[in-house]
Swiss-Prot record:
Name under which the protein is recorded: Immunoglobulin heavy variable 1-69-2
Organism per entry: Homo sapiens
Residues covered by region (Framework-3): 78-115
Disulfide bonds: C41-C115
SMART domains, per the entry: IGv (SM00406)
UniProt-annotated stretches for the region Framework-2: 53-69
Keywords: Adaptive immunity, Cell membrane, Disulfide bond, Immunity, Immunoglobulin, Immunoglobulin domain, Membrane, Secreted, Signal
Top-rank lineage group of the source organism: Eukaryota
Any one of the GO CC terms: plasma membrane
Length: 117
């Protein structure tokens, strides 16, 4: 029996109200500690490069925690100190998709992850 802790990463699908703005995220993931996960967020209904894309974590029973952002126009990123060195946020303007990669996963990374613009 595999007694290794597994990390459940849920990805919330978000929809906006401004002119049918939609942010569609990839599905739930189960990973082992130490692994890496990459979550996608495909947008429609607005010009992708006009707004920053943020990523937020919500652990069970906890509030929202901002992880970082990317400027899709130039790829510039800003990360929260807590996630610095473990998170990489990117944007692919050819597909209007943002990505959040979190490495060296820990049990406390079990959470719902949101993209937001």
């Amino acid at each position: 029996m595999d007694c290794t802790w597994r990390i459940l990463l849920l990805v919330a699908a978000a929809t906006g109200t401004h002119a049918e703005v939609q942010l569609v995220q990839s599905g739930a993931e189960v990973k082992k500690p130490g692994a890496t996960v990459k979550i996608s967020c495909k947008v429609s209904g607005y010009t992708f490069t006009d707004y920053y894309m943020h990523w937020v974590q919500q652990a069970p029973g906890k509030g929202l925690e901002w992880m970082g952002l990317v400027d899709p126009e130039d790829g510039e990123t800003i990360y929260a100190e807590k996630f610095q060195g473990r998170v990489t946020i990117t944007a692919d303007t050819s597909t209007d998709t943002a990505y959040m990669e979190l490495s060296s996963l820990r049990s406390e990374d079990t959470a719902v992850y949101y993209c937001a613009t």
